[in-house]
Each structure stands twice: as structure tokens, then as C-alpha cells.
């Protein structure tokens, strides 16, 4: 018989497992790992430390860890064609903090997207950029194309002369103008950091854009969104920044790198080497198919004239049918898991119920769904959002539909997306 406190926790863990077994997971910042990755996450590595770099550790007993981290670095260099790789950060925000410490000093200027325009919180004064003491200026943004205004950006870089120009976003429909910024950044002495957290798997699979080839000096990213690995971070950079990046990671911002996650990352890198091109291509196809299907059903999907998206995300303005928070809550009752999202025209004080829904297809794709399934998903959302059906009624059909998608695809051992037991 379980201890009552332990039982409370075990019940909640199993409840969450069961929820997602029967739900449509459409949070754009999540994914599901392969069974092999889940196995190594529960290995003895989760008990161990390995401070330092491969071959230069401060503790004994790290020989196998060196093999694992060395293989992860080798695979990442190959997949991303990166001169230098650091796999030790424990999150995407950790990566950004390390990049800011490596490339800038307190009081230096940073250009990044505003949060309502899709910028991540770590690019703002109340998170990583503020921790480094950077003065933050926001990219000029074109609401019509949901992207940075290139001409105004170039002008602003010349005027402000920032130390770091940041690209990347949490609402990220289209590639950012890295190539267009490179020349003017060289002119003013600015480094380019590309936060690829959301699109790292797309980049690995040859989709979306190739920031290192387009002119980025440093690419940061989390490893658990379109890149379907365990939660963690990775930094890719040009060789000239390698020493500063490595020192900003250790001893700067990481002590122990969560070794079980690095083993999972290495396996996911092997999966992406084998299956990444097909996976990334299907994600983009599914996103565009979902956007078209929802548009056909009467939703206000942004950027129709641009094909809705080139990433794993679509953005839907639901301000006239309840707002993002209200609708996300209703969809959750139907086992459709989404999130509300600020849009550029929203007041920052409307975070409780902003205009938008952000929908991601990367996890549905990982579970084997293709374009025809996106039409079915769109119909489920319409029944709740537009037809005003009781969510609990729609839930029954969602559960039946999801029962057909219970295995992880684009990996070596795809059975059992939700196999799990604590009792």
C-alpha cells in the first residue's frame, strides 16, 4: 500500500499520462520522446555528476559519460553542420543566458522581438536579457506578415548600434531575416544570436531556414519542441565563439548537465539523423493543411496569403468567438490541449484573455498523423469553438480518434507512446 503522500503524487502522474493518452496535444512547445529515450531517462545517469568538458572532468567515473556527450556533440555537428556544439545547457533559457554572458556586457544593447510580437520571455528585461543587464530595443514588426520589417530593422540597427541582434520567437510562423541583417551587423560590430528553440527540429531536417549559413554567430535552442528529445538545451556556434560559449556554460551557468537527459539527447540526435528530413517536412505539411482546413471552416487563421505558416505553428485570431483563454479552456474540456497567445495588436495587459490561439502540429506528426488527420482535428476544434457543442460530447469523439495514434513514429523503436506504470 502506498504512503498517502506518495499516492497523491503517483495518482497525479498517472492522471497526466492518461490525459495525454486520450488527448490531442497541440502545445507548440512540447513533444513526445521515443521509448528508448524514456528508458535512458530513468537510468543511473540521473544520479551522477560530470562537471567540465569531455576528457577533462573534475570527478572520476565519467568515462561512459564522455562517450555519451562526445557522441551527442559529433551527431549535432553533423546534423546542423555546426563548427562547435555545446550540449550541456539544461534549458533553452539557460542557453540564452549563456549566450548573453559570452557575447555582451552589462549595459550593452540588445535588439529582440517584443513579447506580443512573438518574442520569448528570455529576450526581455524580466528574464535572461535583464539578468545580464542588457538594454533592450525591440525589432520593428509588420503585423500583416507576422514578421520583422526588414527595411526598418536595418535602419534601426544602424541607429542603435546594438552589441547583439537576436532572432527567433515563441510565436514563429516564418523565417526571420538573418541573411538580411548580416551585413549591417558587421558594419556596427554586432553579433547575431538565433534562438531556434521552437524550430530546432525543422532546422535539423532541412526545413524553415539555416541560420548558421545565413549569418548567425550563435544558435541556441531547447531540445524538446520540434526537436523531439528530452527537455534540455543546445548551443551551436562559429569556432571563434567556442571558448566564450563553453566558459559561459561551465562554470558560468551550468554545474551538472543532467546526464540522463544528455543520453536521451544523443539518441534523439541519432533519430533525427535517420528520420529528421521526413519528420520535419511532414510537420510543415501538416501545419499548412491544418491552417487551410481551419480557414475553410470559418476560422480567422493569420497569414492566409502567405500559406499560413512555414513552421510547426499556426496562429488563429479567436477574439470574436470568445478569446484565447476562454476558448483554450473549452477545448481542454474536449481533450484538445492548446494555449492562448498574445498577438502584436493585443494590449500587454490582456494576457488573461488575448486574441489568439497558437496551435502546433509537431507532436501530432510524431504520433503518425498526416494531412487527412489535420482536417479531422480542425473539425473537432470547430465543433467546440464555432458550433458551440458541449465539449464533453466532442471529447468522446476525440478519445476514439486518438486511440488510433498511440505509437511514436520517426524513431527506431516506435511502439508505446504512453506505456507507463508506477504500481
Swiss-Prot record:
Record's GO cellular component terms: cytoplasm
Modified residues (N6-(pyridoxal phosphate)lysine): 225
Listed GO biological process terms: glycine biosynthetic process from serine; tetrahydrofolate interconversion
Gene3D superfamilies from the UniProt entry: Aspartate Aminotransferase, domain 1 (3.90.1150.10), Type I PLP-dependent aspartate aminotransferase-like (Major domain) (3.40.640.10)
Pathway in which this enzyme or protein is active: One-carbon metabolism; tetrahydrofolate interconversion; Amino-acid biosynthesis; glycine biosynthesis; glycine from L-serine: step 1/1
Keyword Transferase tagged: yes
Name of the top EC class for this enzyme: transferase
Residues that coordinate or bind (6S)-5,6,7,8-tetrahydrofolate: 119-121
Protein name: Serine hydroxymethyltransferase
Species this chain originates from: Methanocella arvoryzae (strain DSM 22066 / NBRC 105507 / MRE50)
Gene: glyA
Amino acid at each position: 500500500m502506498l504512503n498517502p503522500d506518495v499516492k497523491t503524487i503517483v495518482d497525479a502522474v498517472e492522471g497526466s499520462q492518461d490525459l495525454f493518452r486520450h488527448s490531442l496535444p497541440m502545445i507548440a512547445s512540447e513533444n513526445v520522446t521515443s521509448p528508448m529515450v524514456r528508458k535512458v531517462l530513468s537510468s543511473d545517469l540521473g544520479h551522477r555528476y560530470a562537471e567540465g568538458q569531455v576528457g577533462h572532468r573534475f570527478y572520476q567515473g565519467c568515462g561512459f559519460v564522455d562517450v555519451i556527450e562526445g557522441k551527442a556533440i559529433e551527431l549535432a555537428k553533423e546534423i546542423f553542420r555546426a563548427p562547435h556544439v555545446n550540449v550541456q545547457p539544461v534549458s533553452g533559457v539557460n542557453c540564452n543566458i549563456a549566450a548573453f554572458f559570452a557575447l555582451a556586457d552589462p549595459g550593452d544593447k540588445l535588439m529582440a522581438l517584443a513579447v506580443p510580437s512573438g518574442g520569448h520571455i528570455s529576450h526581455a528585461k524580466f528574464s535572461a536579457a535583464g539578468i545580464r543587464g542588457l538594454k533592450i530595443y525591440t525589432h520593428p514588426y509588420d503585423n500583416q506578415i507576422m514578421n520583422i520589417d526588414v527595411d526598418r530593422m536595418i535602419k534601426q540597427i544602424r541607429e542603435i548600434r546594438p552589441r547583439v541582434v537576436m532572432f527567433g520567437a515563441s510565436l514563429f510562423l516564418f523565417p526571420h531575416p538573418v541573411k538580411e541583417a548580416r551585413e549591417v551587423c558587421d558594419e556596427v560590430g554586432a553579433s547575431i544570436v538565433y534562438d531556434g528553440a521552437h524550430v530546432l527540429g525543422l532546422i535539423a531536417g532541412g526545413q524553415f531556414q539555416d541560420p548558421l549559413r545565413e549569418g548567425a554567430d550563435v544558435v541556441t535552442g531547447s531540445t524538446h519542441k520540434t526537436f523531439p528529445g528530452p527537455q534540455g538545451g543546445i548551443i551551436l556556434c562559429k569556432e571563434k565563439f567556442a571558448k566564450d560559449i563553453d566558459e559561459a556554460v561551465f562554470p558560468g551557468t551550468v554545474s551538472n548537465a543532467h546526464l540522463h537527459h544528455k543520453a536521451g539527447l544523443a539518441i534523439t540526435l541519432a533519430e533525427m539523423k535517420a528520420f529528421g528530413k521526413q519528420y520535419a517536412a511532414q510537420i510543415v505539411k501538416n501545419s499548412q493543411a491544418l491552417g487551410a482546413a481551419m480557414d475553410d471552416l470559418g476560422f480567422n487563421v493569420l497569414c492566409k496569403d502567405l500559406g499560413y505558416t512555414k513552421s510547426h505553428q499556426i496562429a488563429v485570431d479567436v477574439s470574436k468567438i470568445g478569446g484565447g483563454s476562454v476558448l483554450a479552456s473549452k477545448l481542454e474540456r474536449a481533450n484538445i490541449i492548446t494555449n492562448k497567445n498574445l498577438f502584436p495588436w493585443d494590449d500587454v495587459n490582456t494576457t488573461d484573455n488575448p486574441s489568439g490561439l497558437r496551435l502546433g502540429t509537431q507532436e501530432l506528426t510524431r504520433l503518425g498523423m498526416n494531412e487527412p488527420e489535420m482536417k479531422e482535428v480542425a473539425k473537432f476544434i470547430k465543433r467546440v469553438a464555432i458550433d458551440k457543442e458541449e465539449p464533453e460530447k466532442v471529447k468522446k469523439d476525440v478519445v476514439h480518434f486518438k486511440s488510433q495514434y498511440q505509437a511514436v513514429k520517426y524513431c527506431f523503436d516506435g511502439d508505446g507512446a504512453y506505456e507507463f506504470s508506477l504500481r
